[in-house]
Amino acid sequence: MAKKAKGNRVQVILECTEMKDSGMPGTSRYITTKNRKNTTERLELKKYNPILKRVTVHKEIK
């Protein structure tokens, strides 16, 4: 069996930061990919949160 090569693209999970701080039940998460070579630090994107019904900051979790 051939060994699978590790690519530069990895799948990451983005989680809403404002949802955790508010104490409301539920969580808003998105799955996306990033290039490990070009983006070494953690991703931080503005995405829509359907529970809060507005755009919030989503950070990469491990």
Swiss-Prot record:
One of its GO terms (molecular function) is structural constituent of ribosome. Keywords: Ribonucleoprotein, Ribosomal protein. Disulfide bonds: none annotated. Pfam families: Ribosomal_L33. GO terms for biological process: translation. One of its GO terms (cellular component) is cytoplasm. PANTHER family: 50S RIBOSOMAL PROTEIN L33, CHLOROPLASTIC, LARGE RIBOSOMAL SUBUNIT PROTEIN BL33C. Belongs to the bacterial ribosomal protein bL33 family. NCBIfam families: PRK00504.1, PRK00595.1, rpmG_bact. This is Large ribosomal subunit protein bL33. It comes from Phocaeicola vulgatus (strain ATCC 8482 / DSM 1447 / JCM 5826 / CCUG 4940 / NBRC 14291 / NCTC 11154) (Bacteroides vulgatus). The gene is rpmG.
